[in-house]
Amino acid sequence: MLYLNHQPHPHSPKTQRALRAADGYLYLGMAEEALEEITGTAETESDQPEVLLARNRVLLHLGRWKEVEALAAHAIKCHPERDEFTVQRAFALHKMKKGDLALSVIDAAPEWIRRTGILHYNLACYEAQLGDIKTARHCISVAIQMNEAMRKNAKSDPDLRGLYN
């Protein structure tokens, strides 16, 4: 996954532990356990971007598209500067067969996000993680056409491993 403007916020020890544990569980393919860990974050920190992003990444792995879309829509309102939520919302809408709405989300994204290729890059990551290698290859190709520097990131990104093996 490639992020822009990633500036982590300080978290309580409880939330830091939950985020690290959830990431570990997700890496091991244990999405339900990861979701349990995210649920253990401090309530006062539940709307922080890193917590919202982590929760939505788990929901993506679980294929809970309606929840992904709703949480991403909320997160876009709370944190409009975070591009990841736009990508997540568009992807969830795409998976729910609401392509027109997905395109409207992408069209509504700030111009600077659309110019960087980050939307296509992150869509490639999601598709690769969910096993649609053909679509992932198309998305990463578009991203690289928009920004050649993404080629280097793509080759070392663990989310895109399936494209290069």
Predicted features along the sequence, with ranges:
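Alpha-helical segment of the N-proximal tetratricopeptide repeat
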Residues: 11-44, 50-61
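Terminal, low-structured helical/coil segments at or just beyond the last alpha-helical repeat
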Residues: 2-6, 145, 149-165
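Register position in tetratricopeptide repeats
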Residues: 27-28, 61, 95, 129, ...
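"A position-specific structural signal for the A-helix of alpha-solenoid helical repeats
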Residues: 16, 20, 54, 88, ...
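Structural marker of alpha-solenoid helical repeat scaffolds
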Residues: 10, 44, 78, 111-113, ...
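Alpha-helical adaptor scaffolds
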Residues: 49-118, 126
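TPR/TPR-like (Sel1-like) alpha-helical repeat modules
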Residues: 128-152
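Canonical positions in the second alpha-helix
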Residues: 7, 40-41, 74-75, 108-109, ...
